[in-house]
C-alpha cells in the first residue's frame, strides 16, 4: 500500500460537520507517480489503484482475476488516525458498507476475519478512496507490506 486508508470516511465526516482534515487533503493531492516508478523498477507486475471499491473490493477483484487468495495483516495497513476516530464516532459512508457487503457476498465462507480484528477495522478496509494509493503484489522500499497472496482462495484478515 502506498497511501493510508480513510479518505472516504473523512470526506463523509467533512460533509456532515465541515471539519477539515489536512492529512486527507495531503493524501488525495499526492500523486502515485513516484510509487509507480518504484514499483516498475522493483519488477512488480500486479497492481491496482485503491479507489471506489476500497482496499477489499480491489483486492478481491485482483485475486479473482489471478486465481489466488490473500491474507491481510491489519496491524500493517496504513490508516489515517482521524479516520479511525471518525469510524468509531459513526461517520461511515454508505458506499463503504456496500463495498464490504459485496465482498462478503462474493466470498461467503472464504471471507474470514480474525478474532483480534474489530468491525471498525474491517470497514476501514472497505472505505472508498478518492485518489487512493496503489495496492501492489510485491515490495517497494518505503511502503508497508500489508499481507501476501496464497494459493488458497478467499481473503483472511488477522
Task: State what each model feature region is.
Residues 1-158:
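Helix-biased detector of long, well-ordered alpha-helical tracts
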Amino acid at each position: 500500500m502506498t497511501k493510508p486508508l480513510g479518505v472516504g470516511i473523512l470526506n463523509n465526516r467533512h460533509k456532515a460537520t465541515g471539519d477539515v482534515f489536512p492529512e486527507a487533503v495531503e493524501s488525495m493531492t499526492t500523486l502515485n507517480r513516484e510509487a509507480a516508478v518504484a514499483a516498475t523498477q522493483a519488477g512488480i507486475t500486479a497492481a491496482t489503484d485503491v479507489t471506489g471499491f476500497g482496499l477489499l473490493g480491489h483486492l478481491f477483484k485482483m485475486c479473482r482475476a489471478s486465481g489466488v487468495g490473500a491474507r491481510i495483516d491489519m496491524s500493517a495497513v496504513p490508516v489515517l488516525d482521524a479516520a479511525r476516530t471518525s469510524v468509531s464516532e459513526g461517520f461511515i459512508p454508505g458506499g463503504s458498507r456496500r463495498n464490504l457487503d459485496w465482498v462478503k457476498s462474493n466470498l461467503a465462507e472464504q471471507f474470514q476475519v480474525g478474532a483480534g480484528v474489530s468491525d471498525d477495522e474491517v470497514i476501514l478496509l472497505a472505505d472508498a478512496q478518492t485518489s487512493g494509493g496503489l495496492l501492489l503484489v510485491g515490495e517497494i522500499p518505503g511502503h508497508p507490506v500489508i499481507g501476501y497472496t496464497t494459493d488458497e482462495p478467499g481473503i483472511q484478515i488477522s
